[in-house]
Amino acid sequence: MSSSSVSGIREAFLDFFEKQGHTRYPSAPLIAEGDASLLFTNAGMVPFKQRFITGVSDVKTATTSQKCLRAGGKHNDLENVGYTNRHHTFFEMLGNFSFGDYFKETAIELAWRFVTKELGLSKERLWITVYSEDQEAFDIWKKITGYTDHKIIRISTSDNFWSMGDTGPCGPCSEIFYDYGDGVPGGLPGTDESDGARYTEIWNLVFMQYNRDESGELHKLPRGCIDTGMGLERIAAVMQGVCDNYETDMFQAIIDRSRSIFGSHDHPIAHRVIADHVRAASFLIAEGLTPGNEGRNYVLRRIIRRAVRYIYQIVGDKFSLHEVVPVLTREGSAGYMGNAYPEIVKAEQSIVSTLKIEEDGFADTLRRGTGILEQEIRGLKSGEVLSGEIAFKLYDTYGFPLDITLDVAKERGLKFDEDGFNRCMAKQKEQSRKHWKGSGEAQTASSHILNKHKATSFVGYENHRVKSMVKEIFCSGEAVTSMGEGEEGIAVLDITPFYAESGGQEGDTGLLKVVTTKCGSVAEVVDTTKSNNVHLHKIRVIRGTLKVGDVVEAVVDKQRREKLRANHSATHILQSVLRTLIGEGIQQKGSLVAADKLRFDFSHALPLTKEQLRTVEMEVNRQIMANQPVIIDHCSLEDAVQEGAIALFGEKYNDQNVRVVSMGSSKELCGGTHVRFTGDIGAFRIISETGIAQGVRRIEAITGHEVVSSMNRDSESLQQVAECLSVPVDQVIEKLKKVFVEQREINKKMATICYTHMNSCAKCIEVGSEIKLYVGEFSNIPVEVVASYVKEKMHTNEVLAISTTDGKRTTFIVGVGESAIKRIKATDIVKALQQIQGKGGGNASIARASLPSEYSAKAAEIIRQTVIDAIQNSGA
C-alpha cells in the first residue's frame, strides 16, 4: 500500500473493493435520512438498511467510507471520549456489502486478502473470532488462513451474533483482531481480560442469513447478505504502529493545532476531547444542524459545550474552539478532510461562526456553574459521593449541563448519586405537571410570588442603597423562613435599589446587610431578575442568618453599576449613529449590556468597512465629548413614537406611560439605567464587528476605563515595536515601510542567487523519451522561491521536481509542461510520494509535497520511476 496515513488507508480500501466489482458510494449524511429510529447514522450499513430488509437492490455489491456519530440515544460514546484510546463521537466506518450476491467464503477471502496483502499485516499478529454455532465460518477461516484451531476463537455471546432489531434480518458475525504484543495489557477475545488494548478488533463481518420473527424463531433467508465494518481510526492506529487512535496522523494534526491555540499544558484528555468534538461538531454543522435544546440540535450543543468546558480547564476564558476548524478544512495538514468530504470545506465559514456564537452564549453559564461546583466538591475526597441534589440544582437553576458535572466528578475520582438526581428531576416534572394542570399544589417559587406579592418598589434610578424589609425567602424553590451561612436562594424585598435584568442589561449585584440585629448577618446578591415586576434577588448568605422580616440595608455594587450605566448609554448612541451613518433601515436584533463590554446586534446585509467603523466610532465619541445631558421623560406610547423615539420591535409597552431616554441624537424607549451626561461614558472603542447570522451583524465595544486599559496595552505594544526598530514611535510606520522595501530587495537578490544556483545544479535525468526530467535538491532555499523558479523555468516538454530542505522536512515543487501533461500530471507524482509519508496537493501543472528529509533520496528515485511508468503506459 502506498501510504499508511488515514487518507491513504481510506482510499486503499475503497479502491480495493472497487476493483473487486463493488460500486463505490459516497458517505450518506450523519443526519439519518428517513429513519425515525436513529438520531444519527451510527454504522456503515445504515444507508443500506432497506436493501437488507426488503432484499431488493439495484446493485449487488457496494463499498463506502461512512461518516458515523455515536453521541445520543442507545449508542452514546460521549462520556468516554478523551478517557480511552478508541472511543469517538465522530468516526469513519469502512465497509463492503453484498445484497444477495457473494456470502461467507468470498467475504472472508476478500477480508483476509485485504489485511494481509494490501495492508501487509502479519498473519502471526491476527486472530479470528466466530459465533460458537457457526461451524461453516470456522471451517472457511481455517481453510483460507491455514490457522490451527486455537487461533480461531468461538464466542457464544451476542458479541458474535448481530441483529437489526427484535425482528428482521440477523446472523452470526466474525471478527478480525490485531495483537499488539506482550508490551500491551489485555487478554484474548472472550476472556475476562479482553477489555485491554492488546487484542484490538479491526474488522467485523456480519453474515445475515436468518430472519427472526415476532416469536423469536429464526428462519433461513433464501439468499444471505454481507455487512462488514472496519473502523478507519482503529486500522490507521495499527498501520502506524500505535495502539492509541489519538496518536494517528490525523488526530495528531488536530491535537497539535489545539496545543498551538490553547498551550501545550499537561492536559492530554482535554486536547483529545477537543480534537474529537471539533470533528463531530464541524460535520454536523456542515449538514445544516444548529445547536438547540431538543433532539439532534441538543446533541450538537452538548458536544460543543463539552469541548468548551475542557478548553476552560486548560486556559480559562479563552473560548476559541472555532480556531481549530481550519486544520480540517484547509489543505496541507494530515487533519484535512476536504479530499474525502468536500462539504466541510464549503461550510467552513458557517462552522466557525456557529461555534463562536455557541461558545459566547455558554461562557457565563460555564464560569458560574464551574465556580459553584468547585465550592461544592472542595471538601470531598476521592471515592466519596457527589450529591445528586447539587448536580440537579446546577442543572435546573444555572443551566449547567449534567455531562460536565459528571466529567468533573470523574476527574476527581468521585462517585455520583444518580438516584438522587433522578428523584429531583422526577419531583420537578411532577411539580411542572401539576402547575400546568392548575392544581395549585406545590407551586414553584415564581408562581407563589405572583399570587402573593405586588410589584416591588424599584428606587434604583435615584439610589444605590436603601433600607428594606425581607418579605419572602425561597430555597430550592420552596418558601422558607430563614437561610444560614453558605446557603443560596431567592429573596423578595418590599423596596429595592437593584435593577433587574431586562432589555439586555445585566441585573445588579451587591449586598444585603441585616440591621435589625447586632449579629452582622450579610447576604451577597449575585444577580437580580424579575417575574411580573416582582424583583427576585438571587442571594448567597456569606455571614450569619437571613430571616423573613429582617430589615436590611440593600447596597448596590456602585462601581459595577456605573460601568453598566456607561455601556447602556453608549449602546443607545451607537444605534443612533448607525442609523444615521449606515442606514435608517437598521433594526436592533439583540443586545448585551455587561459591566466590561457592550454588544449590539443589528440588521445589515454586508460587513462594515474599516472606514465605516472608524467613522461610527468617531461620531459616538464626538457625542460623548459633547457632554450632553441625558433626559428622562414619561409620556404615552403614541406621543413617544410621534416624537421619533425608537421602540424595540416585539417588545410590550404600557400604552399610557412609557419611559423615554434621550441623549444627543438618540431617543429610545428604555427602562434601563443610564449616565447623567454623555461625558460620563468617558470614551468608546469598537473592538470587533462580525456576522452572527444571515443579514445580522454584531458590534462589540468597550467604554470608560476599559478603553484606557485597551489603549495602554496598544501603546505599550507600539513602544516595544519602536524599541525593536530603534526609532521614535512617530517614525515606526515609515521605518517599517523602509524595512519591507529593503526586505523585498534582499528577497529579489536572494532569489537571483538561488535561481543561478538551481540552474547550475539541477540535473537532467534520462527517462527514455523526448520528455526531459530535471531534479535538484537544495538546502534552506525558501519554498516560495523554488515554486517561482519551477513556474518560470518549466517548458512545454519538461518535468521539474525541485526540492528544498530545512534538515527535518523536504518540500518538493513539481512542475509539468503543457505537452508533458498529456502523459503525466504533477499530482500523479505527489500522490506517488505518499508511500514515503509525502503530503501535499496541487493541480495537473504544478503541485507540492512535503516529506521527512531522510526519504529525500528515495523520493528522487520514486519520481523518476513514476515519470518512466507514466510515459510507458501512455505508449511513448
From Swiss-Prot:
Q: Which cofactor does it need?
A: Zn(2+)
Leader sequence segment: none
Give the UniProt record's GO annotations in the biological process aspect.
alanyl-tRNA aminoacylation; negative regulation of DNA-templated transcription
GO function terms (MF aspect):
alanine-tRNA ligase activity; aminoacyl-tRNA deacylase activity; ATP binding; tRNA binding; zinc ion binding
Per the entry, what this protein does is: Catalyzes the attachment of alanine to tRNA(Ala) in a two-step reaction: alanine is first activated by ATP to form Ala-AMP and then transferred to the acceptor end of tRNA(Ala). Also edits incorrectly charged Ser-tRNA(Ala) and Gly-tRNA(Ala) via its editing domain.
Question: Hey, which family's this protein in?
Answer: Belongs to the class-II aminoacyl-tRNA synthetase family.
Domain notes, please?
Consists of three domains; the N-terminal catalytic domain, the editing domain and the C-terminal C-Ala domain. The editing domain removes incorrectly charged amino acids, while the C-Ala domain, along with tRNA(Ala), serves as a bridge to cooperatively bring together the editing and aminoacylation centers thus stimulating deacylation of misacylated tRNAs.
PANTHER family according to UniProt = ALANINE--TRNA LIGASE, CYTOPLASMIC, ALANYL-TRNA SYNTHETASE
NCBIfam families named in the record: alaS
Protein name (Swiss-Prot/TrEMBL)? Alanine--tRNA ligase
Originating species: Anaplasma phagocytophilum (strain HZ)
